[in-house]
Amino acid sequence: MTAEPILSPETAIAALSGEDNQIRYYAAWWLGKHNVQAGFTALCVALFDERYRIPSGGYPLRRQAARALGLLKNPQAVPALIAALECDEDLRLREAVICSLAAIGDKRAVTPLLNLLQSSQAQPYEALIEALATLQVWSARPQIEPFLQHYSERVQCAAARYMYLLTQESEYIERIVKNLNHDNMYLRWAAVFDLGAVAHQQAVQAILTAQVPNSLKLLNLKRILEAMLNNNSVNHEKAALLFGAIDDLLIQL
């Protein structure tokens, strides 16, 4: 029997319990994309559904369910997400879970995340360090500072982001800005997102001249502007410059 097209929350929720893995994956994406809070329970079930497993050992549906729960930002998902951290077979699933816990921002995630950081097993360190920064877990500084020398430049950037948010010292921002001109396109993209996440106003010009798509520049300049406008002491001159830069980028898109 042909599966019903996913055109509504009801059909998406029903599809999650179906047999077609591709449709189930799309249904999880659809529920997150459209912020369907009614899909919360079905997504929590899908988070532990091991039927869809690829030859390399990963669980695509579980990953997508984790991402969708992060988009819903429902704190009731935190216990399920924490339990999903225990899956050692799929680090990409663990990475998706960590990102969603950071997006929800519930402090119940702090201890499990610290346990992962202190584990002797390899972890998705970039996501883990970024999550601890988002949750403002500054007690992790002794464990995170050594990652400034990690072999992965993206992990180094995550550590620099954490250290800047903690100390506000410009040396850490400079480490991120340096990667805006890196030969690796994905590292340039990661650096732009790091600068947007810390809302560093002095990085605006560096973002504008970086070799990244205008859509990424626009997204992260908007994040910096929003952070600036939420600040009680807005620098109106800098805000005006940001508005102008955003307008110019919109025209170019």
UniProtKB/Swiss-Prot annotation:
Listed GO MF terms: lyase activity; oxidoreductase activity
Keyword list, A-Z: Antenna complex, Lyase, Phycobilisome
**Record-level GO cellular component terms:** phycobilisome
Q: Which Cys residues form disulphide pairs?
A: none
Membrane-spanning residues? none
Lineage top rank: taxon = Bacteria
Is tRNA-binding given among the entry's keywords? no
Q: Which PANTHER family match?
A: DEOXYHYPUSINE HYDROXYLASE, PBS LYASE HEAT-LIKE PROTEIN
Similarity-based family? Belongs to the CpcE/RpcE/PecE family.
Role of this protein: An enzyme involved in the biosynthesis of bilin.
Q: What is this protein called?
A: Bilin biosynthesis protein PecE
Q: What is the lineage of its organism?
A: Bacteria, Bacillati, Cyanobacteriota, Cyanophyceae, Nostocales
Gene that encodes the chain = pecE
